[in-house]
A protein has these predicted regions:
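TPR-adjacent "capping" and linker segments in tetratricopeptide-repeat scaffold/adaptor proteins
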Residues: 2-20, 43-48, 116, 179-188, ...
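Alpha-helical segment of the N-proximal tetratricopeptide repeat
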Residues: 17-43, 57, 191-202
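Helix-start (N-cap) detector for alpha-helical repeat units in TPR-like alpha-solenoids
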Residues: 18, 52-53, 86-87, 120-121, ...
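"A position-specific structural signal for the A-helix of alpha-solenoid helical repeats
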Residues: 23, 57, 91, 122-133, ...
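Structural motif corresponding to the intra-repeat A-B loop/turn of tetratricopeptide repeats
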Residues: 31, 65, 99, 134, ...
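Alpha-helical repeat scaffolds
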Residues: 40-42, 68-80, 102-113, 139-147, ...
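Short coil turns that delineate tetratricopeptide repeat
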Residues: 49, 83, 117-118, 152-155, ...
Length: 266
């Protein structure tokens, strides 16, 4: 987020050496102390009011602290118009997205990017999430496929697979004849659950039941491995498995197996 290029930034009385402040800013970002980092950005801006890097860093710090309203307030401040040449469309759109205004978030991205195909990977990821929330699943699917063609093997691959699986399940529910579930290893209970939803939408009850049962097992195993003594984690697991069991009961009912009540009550 920050760099050491802050040396000799232009201030009201001429060039100002801010290299020491930027070195400290990097350290604060590495330990994720965004509160102190934000205050340090303010100090830099006090001596170099036109330092766009410091302003950008400050916006990111506020975003990391979930101060979304404050970010939007800063971006709308007439006193900050001098930074309008800096692309802060991602930060602005993300704030609107987190404040549950997906339509406004998409408007910001469209206004800035012009062509979605020329966007950065971060902008594309955010656009896909926004489109999903707006239930524009076909466009969302196209973006995820485009992203995954160019980013296979990175740290977010499994998360994208899970999201794409959810998109495919919704497309199947909407009756999209061109939709197919993405081929992949089902190495997480979230992907299995989404594949089960895909099968439910297609009326493939047996396949849905199999995936839901395996998803519940994987969910329990994952929770046991990671959070043996965490009561809150146990509550989260109960909520997750509860959702899975409700879907399983529905699938069994559609199969007319007669076991749906037992599944929910166990």
């Amino acid at each position: 987020m920050a760099s050491k290029k802050g040396k000799h930034v232009e201030g009201p009385k001429g060039p100002v050496d801010t290299s020491a402040q930027y070195a400290e800013l990097q350290k604060l970002q590495q330990i994720q102390d965004y509160e102190k980092a934000s205050k340090l950005c303010n100090k830099i801006l006090n001596v170099a009011p036109s330092d766009g890097t410091a302003f950008h860093c400050k916006m990111v710090c506020l975003l990391q602290m979930s101060k979304f309203q404050e970010v939007l307030k800063q971006l709308d401040d007439p006193g900050n118009q001098k930074f309008e040449n800096i692309d802060l469309s991602f930060e602005e759109a993300y704030c609107h997205y987190r404040l549950n205004d997906a339509a406004k978030a998409l408007e910001v991205l469209n206004r800035q990017s012009g062509s979605p195909g020329k966007e950065s990977s971060n902008h594309k990821e955010l656009r896909a999430q926004i489109l999903y929330r707006l239930e524009r699943f076909t466009e969302c699917s196209e973006i995820y496929h485009d992203i995954m063609k160019n980013s296979m093997g990175d740290d977010f691959e499994e998360e994208r697979m899970t999201n794409l699986a959810a998109v495919s399940a919704n497309l199947e529910h909407d009756g999209d004849s061109k939709n197919s579930f993405p081929t992949q290893e089902t190495n997480s209970y979230e992907i299995l659950y989404n594949r089960a939803c895909y099968h439910l939408a297609a009326g493939s009850w047996t396949e849905a039941c199999n995936d839901l049962q395996e998803s519940e097992k994987m969910c329990k195993d994952a929770s046991a491995d990671e959070n043996e003594d965490d009561e809150d984690a146990g509550a989260d697991q109960d909520e997750e498995t509860g959702i899975i069991r409700v879907q399983l009961a529905y699938a069994l009912q559609m199969q007319d197996s007669g076991y749906e009540r037992e599944v929910v009550l166990v």
